[in-house]
Amino acid sequence: MIMNPKIHNKILKNLAKLKKKVFTKYAAYDFNFAYDKNGNVYLVGVDNVTNQTFNLIKPVFKFLKKPLPAELYGMDQQPFYFVNNHHYIDALNSDTGEQELLRYNVIDQSLVNAQTNDLVDPAFYTDLEGYELDLSQYTGSLLDLSNEVISVEQQPVEQEVNLTPEQVEEAEQVEQQPVDQQQVQQVDPNLNEQPVEGDNQNFTQQYYDQQLGYADQNVDYGYDPQQYTQEQDYVDNTQQYDQVQDYVDPNQQYYDDQQQYDQQGYDQGYDQQYDQQGYDQQGYDQGYDQQYDQQYYDDQQQYDEQPDQQVKAVVEQVVDEVVEEQQPVEVAKPAPTKPVGPKPQPGKKATKYVIKKPEPKPKVVKEEPIEPAVEKEEVVTVVEQVVDQPVQVAEVQPEPVVVADDEIKLASEQPVKKKINLDDLQQIPVVIKLPKFETPKLPEPKADSEQKEEIAVKVVEQPVENPQVQETKHHHALPKVKIEKRQEVELVPSKLDDHYDLIEEEDDFFVDKFKFEDIKLSDLLVEQKPIEVNQPVQQPVVLEQSTPSVQAQPQSVEPKLEITKLEELVEIKTDNTESLNKLETLIDENKKIIDQFKQLKEEAKKSNSNINLEKVAKQLVDYLTNKLNEKTAALNKPEPSTVELNKVEQAKQKAVEKLVHEQVVFQPREKVVQQPKEVVAKPYFEESDDLLTSVSNKPKQPTSELLDFLVQQVVDGEEDDLPPPTNFDKWPNQNVRQKLDEINQVEAQRFNQTQFVPPQSLNQVETPNQRLFLEPEIQVQPQALYTASREHEQVQPKAQHQQPTTRIEREEVVNKFQREPLVSPNRLAYHSNKEFDDLYQNHYEQRTARINPQDSYYDQGYEQPDPYQEQQPYPQEQYLDPRYQQQVDPRYQKETYQEYNRPFPPNQEYDYYPPAYESRRDYQPYQPRRVNYEVRKPLAYEFSKQPAPRRYQQLPNRYNESDQSRQLAYPVHKGTLRTEADFLRFREGYGYDYDRPSTQYYRSNYDTYVREVRRPIRQLGMIEPVAEFRSRTLAPRRVARPTYGLRRVSRIPSLAPRGYNQQPRVRRVPVSRGYW
């Protein structure tokens, strides 16, 4: 079907207005555009109740005020049938829980409450089962001409058609010409030329009806070679080529014609060219065909390419001859402006090519007044058919419905297990209540509704007699269910559907009830103050005031004091320069004390008494730190008077003098090691990073037991089980006691001075004085825990943190072989130019157009994400943890069968080059053997990991298999890849190697011509069930028991799946010899 071009263009021009008009005026109906054989447009409405179609009251064009013709065509050029654009949906309002009737309009996709006509949001409604509304299932008629609209804008119409009233009348007469469908169908569309008289080549069959676009076989036109040039001016370039055409103007050729490429985009040109019907039928490019074969046009083609050029034909002649001589094919031509082609020559009108002639019809149809009557007759016949059908159905239906009743009856009795006799059935009174099943009465097909009522009557009256029927017709139980649903729906009490929220519920505690009259306007108004200019300036000031309080906090924290060397008297290392300055001031204040100390030292030299100066110094340092604490505390307090300060200083000086005096005078010279006082065991803290930075770990106080024990070790070193200490260098004259004393230098805590107490963590661990083995009172230091738990980071612990020991610590071997770290998943594709471009982007001019990475046409195989690689590789300890290991699947054999039938993607054969997302790496012929083992740790002290791993982990880490740490030598299916299975293949001297062709045992013809060596793929028998990693869940209470014994090699074969092949199953490895 080809629409009359005038009307078609007019529709397309006014399409927006038309749609708007139709929506506003006829929203109650469903409607669509349609046109008849002659290309006249109708606006077809349908009544949603009766499904009756009609021409809408004010049609699109004024001259079309008639009833609808019998044969209509849709905009998709198919026979027109009406699809509802409005669908009625029963839905539940998810707020109120009430059932409502909604109307869905497919065209503008709006949802309306059918009772109130309010627009409604589908998100707040569910269907009767409680699921979301699925509006995609409702389809509508084709109203969308948007494609054609675009094409009209690209091909601007040059002259707009304004029909004069005479032309309109003329067109109406033509439209009322009958259409003979039979003759239309007989035409061969590929029939381009038929010689009318065999010897005369001037006769062609190319003349066609201007509207319908098929060859007119009853009218034969003579070919007058003069008429192209004289009447039609066909060779006149201005007329033929200046309109917007799809082919190239032969005068302009390709170069001058910028219009075709500039004005419309490149692809649009192609769309127009290939969308048209004429092009689809013949495969060649018709623009060129016209240039080279211009003597023999196909008129059909010329017409398709010049849709806007108006054509004049002598209408009267054609009509007269058609009616008198024989009935022509439908002639429905608009009033044209130019004649189409050569005038028909009456002499040639022999009946040579007539295919079929309808008998009586044409003479009747020629007269105008009879035409509506004919159409009405057709409508009536359709109704008769509709009436016939329900009568037949009525005869068949009553039996199944009876059966449904029968089944209701029996279902109630099923719990009784006796065999049911007919007599029992008759004794039990049968009461069947069926709801009244009223269908809305449709006005036109009356017989249908009457018949349904009769059926309902029959159902109730039929007695239940033969139970045998139940068995045969059992599937008719379905109507029963529907009826029950209908009942439930009707039982919903009417008070619930309160669409306007008029009813107040009495027990609504949550909403404060108020009247609208109580709301004052002043409550709703916002106070409007002028904006202050200063505001933005004030905000930062507030921030500045708050900052010093933050800075003041670290000042209260004590600096750590560490004694580095004792040669210089007191050198103090501090964290902050501030605290250092304070300390200097403190020392200046206490110079007198230091002077006194020097005097004492000199006195000691004179009297030859052994003063343990180091201990004195330590006590002094303790005193100074205590002093510093007081100083910092005093900074926050109001300053005391100078008199008080002097008193305090004097007291302190006396204390120091007394201390030093005790040291020198009252110390008996035999006791080199002072008797330790009992000290309460300090709490130590479980390791956590922030605490360890702030706590300085001091070694424990030595006890007499400890010292005796160590001395004992030194004395009988050879006899003892433990290895003797090895690190005694030759020292200057000192006895053993002094050496030990130096090894275990410990801060003497003389006074209970107020020392800085670090903030206590919640998980504080109190260690009782327990004796581990033979080592009395040696408790594990938090520092040791810290280093033990972090051994895999090769951080050398500082000397001051180490526990006192008698052996040289072996240097930790730095791991030479460390696995390549996991490359982050967003690494570049190996053919991407990114690094290159980043380096050189300013240094060279880019000569090629860059492909837009968003362009879906170009990104085929390259930047695709890998289906197997996780977005983030799993954290290591999670991957190793045995609790999260997935159980081996007991349905193992079934899996193997699936594996065997797996559809391989087509590129498997070329899988040996690295996939696109992976960077290239150098070829490693084998994996280095594993050198380093985890250092042994005592399990008792491992707090960080709950399930303690094995002491020695023999196997290499199973890290993420999708990250290949080397280039594999053969194509691999990632799902199948097992690293452990390959252990020989990549060792030097075994297996396949690219570099040594002697290794390649099996070669095929493929290998000799294509250099790439083909190897056997991973075979079925090698596949073991791979336990895939499962992301972390809660640990199960116990490990599930494996389904089969640990070391069982084969499974007991089951009988069933072994089809025609009766040999017993044996697990063996099928080896391919290199041919795939």
Swiss-Prot record:
Residues 562-616 form a coiled coil. The lineage of its organism: Bacteria, Bacillati, Mycoplasmatota, Mycoplasmoidales, Mycoplasmoidaceae. Binds immobilized fibronectin. Component of the cytoskeleton-like structure which stabilizes the shape of the wall-less mycoplasma. This cytoskeleton-like network of accessory proteins containing HMW proteins 1 to 5 allows the proper anchoring of cytadhesin proteins in the mycoplasmal membrane at the attachment organelle. Essential for successful surface parasitism. Its main location: membrane. One of its GO terms (cellular component) is attachment organelle membrane. Residues 326-335, 862-873 have a biased composition (Low complexity). This is Cytadherence high molecular weight protein 3. It comes from Mycoplasmoides gallisepticum (strain R(low / passage 15 / clone 2)) (Mycoplasma gallisepticum). GO terms for biological process: adhesion of symbiont to microvasculature.
